[in-house]
């Protein structure tokens, strides 16, 4: 589950490898709701095409989501089963993505009591700076 080698991932690999070879920076961007943080330079690697809930096991409290999935879509899916995440990330109304929320770690005031979103991530599949697919963790049941 998670990241399969689809056309989007292959295109990202080519973009990453091209940037690496040319020495050009890349900036990973979903909805762009956090573009005002820091200095955003480089060609955009857009995650919005990599969306969707890959799997959802409500009885196990486990969901696998792609990085470009809007946070609001994840919340709606969980809400259908009377489930929720204990986070209130900013910029949801502007289309914040799951990848952006996890990457920024901005999960709202409840963090003091429930922890950060990264404390709830069981695993991740990602591409490194060489365009290699790396897999960390996984589902625990």
Predicted regions and their residues:
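Short, charge-rich amphipathic segments
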Residues: 2-20, 113, 118-130
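Glycine-rich N-terminal segment of FAD-binding domains in flavoprotein oxidoreductases
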Residues: 3-92
């Amino acid at each position: 589950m998670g990241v399969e080698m689809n056309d989007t991932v292959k295109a990202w690999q080519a973009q990453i490898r091209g940037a690496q070879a040319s020495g050009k920076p890349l900036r990973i961007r979903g909805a762009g709701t956090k573009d005002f943080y820091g200095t955003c330079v480089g060609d955009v690697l857009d995650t919005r095409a990599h969306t969707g809930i890959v799997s959802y096991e409500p009885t196990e409290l486990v969901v696998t989501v792609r990085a470009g999935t809007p946070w609001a879509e994840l919340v709606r899916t969980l809400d259908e089963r009377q489930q929720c995440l204990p986070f209130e990330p900013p910029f949801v109304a502007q289309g914040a993505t799951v990848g952006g929320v996890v990457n920024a770690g901005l999960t709202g005031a409840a963090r003091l009591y429930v922890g950060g979103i990264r404390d709830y991530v069981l695993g991740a599949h990602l591409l490194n700076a060489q365009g290699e697919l790396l897999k960390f963790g996984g589902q625990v049941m």
